[in-house]
From Swiss-Prot:
One of its GO terms (cellular component) is extracellular region. The lineage of its organism: Eukaryota, Metazoa, Cnidaria, Anthozoa, Hexacorallia. This is U-actitoxin-Avd8d. Keywords: Cleavage on pair of basic residues, Nematocyst, Secreted, Signal, Toxin. Residues 1-19 form the signal peptide.
Length: 83
């Protein structure tokens, strides 16, 4: 009886592990930059400590009158995809 429970738990664990590893591959593929964004003119004026951590992609969508929105569009063009 105990060996049957252990076998069922191992099978369920294996199935879940396969699903998670497939899901991680999809997530990594989504976060790759498109080829047109890797050209020379498309870059962030500040390091990734600012463009990516302090300034996020949501800040690119803010109103142009907001400080974060205007800074993001001017200085973090690669992050916002404005190239």
């Amino acid at each position: 009886m105990a060996s049957t429970r252990l076998f069922v738990l191992l099978v369920i664990g294996t199935v879940l592990l396969c699903q998670v590893s497939g899901f991680l591959d999809e997530l990594l593929a989504e976060h790759e930059l498109p080829q047109d964004m890797t050209k020379r003119g498309c870059r962030n004026a500040y390091s990734s400590a600012i463009c990516g951590k302090v300034i996020t992609a949501d800040d690119c969508m803010r109103k142009s009158s907001s400080r974060m929105g205007s800074f993001a569009r001017k200085k973090c063009q690669r992050l916002c995809g404005i190239c």
